[in-house]
Regions:
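Short, solvent-exposed helix-to-loop capping segments enriched in aromatics
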Residues: 71-95
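Residue-level signal for mature regions of secreted extracellular proteins and peptides
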Residues: 62, 70-71, 117, 144
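Boundary/linker segments of alpha-helical solenoid repeat arrays
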Residues: 64-69, 138-139
Length: 172
């Protein structure tokens, strides 16, 4: 193989990898329907928008909320996790995720920032989104949560929050 051909092939591969990396960096992750459901749910729950938050709960999680949360409200459960001295929610963003069950579920970590005291380190939230038929983009439902704690605390990472049965604020 001629040297120029080898250089062209290597250049093409490097350019292709660079293009893929650039597109992954530029495309917002919450364009994935599961990630969008997770961030939208977190925002709605933290802002007290009960109807929006409850609309994306799985039937099993909705039953858990009805039985275990004050007034059977998901926003009351989640609002109870957040100290008043953190202030108002600034925003929630997607942080990372792990694909599960052959694409029918995602274990997702979102990151919330608050007006006072929890801006830089933030609040780490774990959510599991499931969709029995992934081809249906509207079918994603929240089936579990944990966290809603400062990212400064020990064991607040995605792996700990999704696998530890004693994770803080877990449901169910």
């Amino acid at each position: 193989m001629r040297r120029i051909t080898l250089v062209l092939i290597i250049g093409f591969v490097v350019a292709l990898v660079g293009l893929i990396a650039l597109s992954l960096w530029l495309v917002p992750q919450d364009t994935n329907p599961a990630f969008a459901v997770a961030t939208d749910f977190s925002r709605a729950a933290l802002r007290g928008h009960e109807a929006d938050a409850a609309a994306v709960l799985s039937p099993e999680l909705a039953a858990y909320v009805a039985e275990n949360c004050p007034d059977g409200a998901v926003t009351a459960c989640i609002g109870g996790y957040i100290p008043d001295d953190w202030g108002d929610l600034v925003d929630v963003v997607y942080r990372r995720s792990v694909l599960q069950d052959s694409g029918r579920a995602w274990d997702i970590q979102t990151f919330a920032s608050f007006q006072h005291g929890q801006g830089f380190s933030g609040v780490c939230i774990y959510l599991r989104a499931e969709n029995p038929t992934p081809a249906n983009a509207d079918g994603w439902k929240i089936t579990r949560w944990a966290g809603w704690v400062s990212c400064d605390v020990e064991n607040k990472g995605l792996d700990a929050l999704r696998t530890d049965p004693d994770a803080p604020n877990h449901a169910p």
